Swiss-Prot record:
Interacts with glycoprotein H (gH); this interaction is necessary for the correct processing and cell surface expression of gH. The heterodimer gH/gL seems to interact with gB trimers during fusion. This is Envelope glycoprotein L. Residues 23-148 are annotated as: Interaction with gH. One of its GO terms (biological process) is fusion of virus membrane with host plasma membrane.
Length: 159
């Protein structure tokens, strides 16, 4: 199981991200923000979004086809709210996304693929493990109020 957690921390290669397009709900906001980074390894050293939220530049990637321009996906599980970052090598930009929508979409995409393989199976096991102990929840922006561990991420003040 430790290898699965490590797998979620690495950058998923372009071949995986192109093969498994993300299924997204049309009315759910996907992108939280963007930051120019010269190398993908710098994503791991960035502090969690909730600790530096106001210092970022927010925008969706200015690309027409995400799956063709996308170089990789980074999942940071050490943050209070897991972070999913899309990396665009050509633009040297990292885009932070709604982790619940992105992970759920990636798991659905990988699950619908009928091919088998070691990488696919390990990825599917790791992604499905995220949802094992979770209760069903909405992927919409939370209502006003306190969100534990993410008060600054959702611009809430926990009292």
């Amino acid at each position: 199981m430790a290898s699965h957690k490590w797998l979620l921390q690495i950058v998923f290669l372009k071949t995986i991200t192109i093969a498994y397009c993300l299924h997204l709900q049309d009315d759910t906001p996907l992108f939280f923000g963007a930051k120019p980074l010269s190398d993908v390894s710098l994503i791991i050293t960035e502090p969690c979004v909730s600790s530096v939220y106001e210092a970022w530049d927010y925008a969706a990637p200015p690309v027409s086809n995400l799956s063709e321009a996308l170089s990789g996906i980074v999942v940071k599980t050490k943050c209070p709210v897991p972070e999913v970052i899309l990396w665009f090598k050509d633009k040297q930009m990292a885009y932070w996304t709604n982790p619940y929508v992105t992970l759920k979409g990636l798991a659905q995409s990988v699950g619908e693929e009928h091919k088998s393989g070691d990488i696919r199976d390990a990825l599917l096991d790791a992604l499905s493990g995220v949802w094992v102990d979770s209760t069903p929840s909405s992927t919409n922006i939370p209502e006003n109020g306190c969100v534990w561990g993410a008060d600054r991420l959702f611009q809430r003040v926990c009292q």
